Amino acid sequence: MRAICIERPGSMSIIDVPVPVPGSGEVAVTIAYVGYCGSDLTSYRGLNPLISYPRVPGHEISGRIAALGPSVTGLTVGESVTVLPYFNCGKCNACRMGRPNACKHNQTMGVQREGAMTPTVVVPAEKIIPVSGVAARDLALIEPLAVGFHAVRRAGLETGETVVVLGCGVIGLGVTLGAVRRGARVIAVDLAAGKLAVARALGAAETIDASTTDVAAEVRRLTGDDGPQVVIEAVGADVTFRQAIELVGSCGRVVYVGYAKAPVTYDTKQFLLKEMEVRGSRGSERRDFEEVIAHLKAHPDVGAHVISKVVPFEEAGPAMAAWDADPGGFVKIVVALEATNA
């Protein structure tokens, strides 16, 4: 069978790979759609320190169960599923604490191990999440939105609080959805007007175009002297890492869900004077997936707002090149593999 492969930075191709067969405790999944993640873009650009080449990308998965390996129960061939794409060790202190998403030895599909940009994948049965009542295309949104929902949970965001969301890519939009779901007021910030329009459609109370507006002054105008209780950084840039601690109000919480690609310097007195809390947020957990699924069932229009483009398998490479050339022009690109499986 064929697979999309990032051969080296800036180069993608279609390669032949063996058809996998499920072993004991494993499930074969026929892939319907796969979303391109920001980590796939950084891998394409040669900026992802976690990847080795060549690599089949893809961990935002929509599919159907094709076959069950021996000893698998509770699942049915043909049912729609998404996949928890993180493989934790089960032994490190994070795993023992019940926080497998923070596993020291985690391997994510499409990053440290081969991904899902291929007609069939085989995964352990415990990684399968059956989903009904959500469009097949939109199943590919569950994983990235869950990363945003997890960041909201890490923030401990409460009803009535104000959160500034730095970045309106799909992770930032997941933060926006998760925050609105909790009854918070969202102020979304981005450089791209189109992404800000999506944030408003998903419930952001206010948006700030950082390309034309003094973000600090506008946040101050919108929140007064108190400032926001929470700032969630979903860009992964040194400027927004610093901006997060500058914007948050006294005794507030900063959550980093992006990570800067270079060391960041801070005016460290801000940490003390504001007595702020700074928290990291990594990936997501099954309960975050389940919350996103519930939200998509209740709000079936989310996919229409978030997905910018659906491309066939053969155009996956050119689509990545287009995203690389104009990252602000797309929120989410989804690759359709259904025709490939026909």
Per-region residue spans from a language model:
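Residues in the short beta-alpha loop(s) of Rossmann-like NAD(P)-binding domains
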Residues: 47, 192, 260, 284
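NAD(P)H dinucleotide-binding glycine-rich loop of Rossmann-like/cofactor-binding domains
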Residues: 89-166
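Residue-level marker of beta-strand positions
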Residues: 60, 79-80, 94, 120, ...
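Glycine-rich beta-strand-centered segment in the early N-terminal region that forms part
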Residues: 20-34, 47-93, 132-134
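Mid-domain Rossmann-like dinucleotide-binding core that forms the NAD(H)/NADP(H) cofactor-binding site
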Residues: 134-212, 217
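C-terminal hydrophobic helical "lid"/dimerization subdomain
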Residues: 242-246, 286-342
